């Protein structure tokens, strides 16, 4: 007799841990640190591990730790090493890039922005090593490289903001500080300086893809949950014995918007929308100040804004 399980009624089985497919010759062994967590099982797979780091993973974590350590200690020093003030003012604390007087020189005194350069260097190295690790793990498992290229799109935006655009502008001061509210302040000031990013067509595309990603994610998630009582979340069963879940989901969207995605195409749509969010966003940031000084005036000249 078929039973319907969802997040509230599912049964968690704990057996011998699944260690994954065999590794190719020359790869290090996975760390056999495994276990089960009840609450992880409520949200996804209850099994923890096995973990595979390799030298790339270890190096990435090490450089990431150094970056966070530099940022954290500088923030702590800015409140006179007071743990209470650090916690109270955490969202307002920052580690700022060098001032405009230093240009794009890598040789800046630590107290005047050198710490920011060091933290950025270690953080960038950590991110790039993690990307290489994700690429190698995907190749090792015989997977496609979709995750790697999506991650690369996010790295593109990060590099544009922190390195490529400041390099083209000739000043580290064009980059973003480390910090939560200071980062938001930088974003607001950046928009004001360059005549309102709302008139930047690549920014508009980025926002459209961002909202589109949220919409696609909500539509896909809601559809699968709506037909999970018919086994809609079990993709293997849907391929080999379709039952009624796929038909009902497809029919619902044909009724409501005229056509429906397939089990494959919805993921391709979501992937492209997510990738294009950061890709177009990076292009919009890169063009600001280097090619277009004031986006509002540019929009007027091209009949994109009123008053043109």
Language model segments and positions:
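Final/C-terminal transmembrane alpha-helix of multipass membrane proteins
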Residues: 264-293
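Alpha-helical transmembrane segments and their helix-start/interface "positive-inside/aromatic belt" motifs
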Residues: 41-63, 135-156, 204, 264-275
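Cytoplasmic membrane-interface regions of multi-pass membrane proteins
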Residues: 33-44, 79-103, 122-148, 218-266
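Hydrophobic alpha-helical transmembrane segments
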Residues: 99-120, 185-215
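Hydrophobic alpha-helical membrane-insertion segments
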Residues: 57-75, 147-169, 208-215, 276-285
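Juxtamembrane/interface segments at transmembrane-helix termini
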Residues: 2, 72-80, 131-144, 163-176, ...
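Membrane-interfacial helical/loop segments at transmembrane boundaries in membrane proteins
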Residues: 75-106, 163-198, 236-255, 294-308
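N-terminal juxtamembrane cytosolic/stromal segments of multi-pass membrane proteins
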Residues: 1-59, 83-98, 251-256
């Amino acid at each position: 007799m078929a039973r319907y399980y969802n997040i509230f009624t599912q049964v968690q089985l704990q057996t011998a841990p699944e260690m994954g497919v065999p590794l190719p010759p020359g790869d290090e062994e996975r760390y056999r640190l495994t276990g089960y967590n009840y609450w992880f099982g409520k949200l996804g797979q209850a099994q923890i591990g096995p973990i595979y780091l390799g030298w790339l993973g270890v190096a990435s974590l090490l450089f990431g730790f150094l970056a966070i350590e530099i940022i954290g200690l500088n923030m702590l020093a800015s409140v006179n090493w007071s743990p209470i003030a650090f916690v109270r003012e955490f969202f307002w604390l920052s580690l700022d890039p060098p001032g405009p007087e230093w240009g794009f020189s890598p040789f800046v005194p630590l107290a005047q922005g050198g710490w920011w350069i060091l933290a950025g260097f270690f953080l960038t190295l950590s991110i790039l090593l993690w990307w290489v690790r994700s690429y190698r793990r995907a190749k090792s498992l015989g997977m496609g490289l979709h995750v790697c290229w999506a991650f690369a799109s996010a790295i593109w935006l990060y590099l544009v903001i922190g390195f490529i655009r400041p390099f083209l502008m000739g000043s580290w001061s064009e980059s973003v500080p480390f910090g939560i509210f200071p980062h938001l302040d930088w974003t607001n000031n950046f928009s004001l300086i360059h005549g309102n990013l709302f008139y930047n067509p690549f920014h508009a595309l980025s926002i459209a893809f961002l909202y589109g990603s949220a919409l696609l994610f909500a539509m896909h998630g809601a559809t699968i949950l709506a037909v999970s009582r018919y086994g809609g979340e079990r993709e293997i069963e849907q391929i080999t014995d379709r039952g009624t879940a796929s038909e009902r989901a497809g029919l619902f969207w044909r009724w409501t918007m005229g056509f429906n995605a397939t089990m494959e195409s919805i993921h391709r749509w979501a992937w492209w929308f997510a990738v294009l969010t950061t890709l177009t966003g990076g292009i919009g940031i890169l063009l600001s100040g280097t090619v277009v000084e004031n986006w509002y005036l540019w929009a007027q000249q091209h009949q994109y804004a009123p008053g043109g």
